[in-house]
């Protein structure tokens, strides 16, 4: 992983935090991005002796202006270009049903889970293409394959879109040395679960995949020889829990 510079969105918690720590453990210069400086600082502190490899940048990547500002700041501070991009930032709606979700919740979920990924890929791919080397890894979701109330209508639609976007990048730019991977996990014990109508309890969360499990997959994918690309990864918890109460709660939450 020499001469690598990794950018991770949503690095202040969950999968993004675990991934940043994993890359730092492997001595990879890593930039974590998020809206909360305190959360980013906590990620850096949790890396302990490897914290020197983690760089924190407070940024709003929900719009093109924020992404352009982030790009300019990285370009100014670092000699290397971002050659590993991990699109991890995401959000879900409180109302999951397509029949009841307000447009503002729909727009917010689609914007952060799909539109911002398109914008940040477009911006940072230019240097990857120029240098004939780049890896883009996007945390999609099992909701892309199995839409329903557990993830919610806008979340599933956005994740299906972003999975297709990674395929489009591979189709167009693989011969330019660009690799794009879509990782589609089932339930992972992260703060996004707190947006559900029925918030999973500790026992339920203990059966789920943990952020560090996904971090292992992200690192493995990025660390493969450049001649090899894992285009899609579908990963689930070994234990299949009963989610009927979760689905019922989501169905009944209409405001």
What are these regions (language model features)?
Residues 12-14:
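Conserved glycine-rich cofactor-binding loop
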Residues 58-70, 103:
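The beta1-alpha1 cofactor-binding region of Rossmann-like NAD(H)/NADP(H)-dependent oxidoreductases
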Residues 141:
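Residue(s) in the substrate-gating loop at a strand-loop-helix junction
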Residues 182, 202-248:
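C-terminal helical subdomain
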């Amino acid at each position: 992983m020499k001469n690598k510079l990794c950018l991770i969105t949503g690095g202040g918690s969950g999968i993004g935090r675990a991934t940043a720590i994993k890359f730092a453990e492997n001595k990879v210069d890593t930039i974590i991005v998020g809206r909360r400086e305190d959360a980013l600082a906590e990620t850096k502190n949790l890396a302990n002796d490897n914290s020197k490899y983690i760089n924190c940048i407070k940024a709003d990547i929900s719009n093109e202006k924020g992404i352009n500002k982030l790009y300019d700041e990285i370009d100014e501070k670092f000699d290397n270009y971002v050659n590993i991009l991990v699109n991890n930032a995401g959000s879900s709606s409180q109302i999951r049903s397509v029949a009841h979700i307000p447009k503002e919740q729909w727009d917010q979920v689609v914007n952060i889970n799909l539109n911002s990924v398109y914008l940040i890929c477009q911006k940072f791919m230019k240097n990857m293409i120029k240098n004939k080397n780049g890896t883009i890894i996007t945390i999609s979701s099992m909701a892309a394959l199995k839409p329903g109330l557990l993830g919610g209508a806008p979340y599933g639609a956005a994740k299906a879109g972003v999975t297709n976007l990674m395929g489009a990048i591979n189709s167009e730019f693989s011969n330019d040395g660009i690799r794009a991977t879509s990782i589609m996990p089932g339930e992972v014990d992260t703060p996004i679960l707190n947006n559900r109508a029925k918030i999973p309890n500790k026992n339920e969360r203990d059966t789920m995949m943990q952020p560090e499990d996904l971090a292992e997959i992200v690192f493995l994918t990025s660390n493969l020889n450049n001649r090899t690309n894992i285009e899609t990864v579908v990963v689930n918890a070994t234990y299949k829990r009963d989610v009927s109460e979760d689905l019922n709660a989501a169905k009944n939450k209409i405001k």
